[in-house]
Each structure stands twice: as C-alpha cells, then as structure tokens.
C-alpha cells in the first residue's frame, strides 16, 4: 500500500490560521493533511499524524477531484496542504494542486521547507502561497531538536523568494528558553 491519496485531516479554516495574514485575508481554506514528516521535531504539535503508521485507522482515500469538490462545496478560496509535511506526499499534493488550479482555486503549502533542490521547482510551481515554519535560525537547534541540517531550509527560503511567484510568509513557533534568544 502507498500513501497516495490518503487524507488524515480535512477542515475548513480561515486562511489566517495557516497562518497567512496577507494572502486572500478573510477567506476560507480547505485544510488538508496526509501522514508523515521528513523532520523529527521533538516539539511537534501534530505528532499523531506526522509519526503515524496506521493508514486504515487514521485516513480516508480522497482523489484530487474529491478535494476540489469539497473546496467548492464549502466555498473555500483555497486548498491548504498543512497539519503534516506536504512534501512527503509530493506526488499527491501536486496532483491535487493542479486539479485545484484548473478550477480556479488557490493553493497553499505549510511546510518546514526541508526539500531536495531537484524537487523544489515542480512542487512549488503548483503553489500560490507558502508558509515556511522556520524552527530556529540555529544550526545546532535543527540538529538537536529536528535531526536535520538547517541549510536545505535556508536554501528553500532563498529559492522561494528569488525563483518563484509564490506569496511567502515565515512562521516560528517560540519555545521559551530554547529558541527565543
């Protein structure tokens, strides 16, 4: 069994909850999560889906067309790939995003930005807006708490700003005493 098309979470949210405060403010986003993450953050807020292995218990199948129908039915202006890392379901996310665009829906990725350079162009070319969750500006923080290097994340931020037309906002979850200095 593959993870393609398995949706763990589906909700209608204000776009500001992504959080995007300057991209279609005041509109609704159909928020969609799958399973998995390519980071191992010790402080993960959605660990129950980022580390889940049981597709049958946590997920439902949803074709790209079904997601578009749900967004239109709920009068959502956009579909946001959120709750877990959308890059780990890139093939599915890209297919859903393309189906959304065909129907005039905007697409949003809420991501940690940890993506190989060879995959960036195809993935982000399907997105209208991106919120990158920058965990910290510290190499040691990323190694100790996320188990990855910060460099690919910083490269993704530069790529998004200089090579795409994506609206970009950055979020950092403040962990008192850990990444707040």
Model segments located where?
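A short alpha->loop->secondary-structure connector
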Residues: 49-60, 102
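A generic secondary-structure signal marking the coil-to-beta-strand transition
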Residues: 28-30, 40, 77
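Glycine-rich His-Gly loop
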Residues: 34-36, 83
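Conserved AdoMet/S-adenosylmethionine-binding subsite of the radical SAM
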Residues: 61-181
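Cys/His-coordinated zinc-binding microdomains
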Residues: 38, 45
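N-terminal [4Fe-4S]-dependent radical SAM core
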Residues: 1-34, 47-51
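Short, functionally important structural connectors and interaction interfaces within domains
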Residues: 12-16, 29, 54, 80, ...
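Generic domain-boundary/flexible-linker signal
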Residues: 43, 52-55, 90
């Amino acid at each position: 069994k593959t993870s393609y098309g398995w949706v763990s979470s589906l909700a209608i949210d204000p776009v500001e909850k992504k959080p995007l405060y300057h991209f279609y403010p005041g509109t609704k986003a159909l928020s969609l999560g799958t399973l998995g993450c390519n980071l191992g953050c010790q402080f993960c807020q959605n660990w129950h889906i980022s580390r889940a292995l049981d597709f049958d218990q946590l997920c439902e199948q949803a074709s790209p067309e079904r997601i578009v129908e749900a967004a239109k039915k709920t009068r959502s202006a956009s579909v946001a790939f959120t709750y877990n890392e959308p890059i780990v379901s890139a093939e599915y996310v890209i297919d859903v995003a393309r189906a959304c665009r065909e129907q005039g829906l905007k697409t949003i990725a809420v991501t940690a930005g940890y993506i190989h350079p060879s995959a960036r162009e195809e993935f982000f070319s399907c997105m209208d807006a991106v919120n990158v969750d920058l965990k910290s500006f510290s190499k040691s923080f990323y190694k100790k708490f996320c188990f990855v290097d910060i460099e690919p994340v910083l490269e993704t931020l530069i790529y998004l700003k200089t090579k795409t037309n994506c609206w970009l906002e950055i979020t950092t979850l403040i962990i008192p005493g850990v990444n707040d200095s």
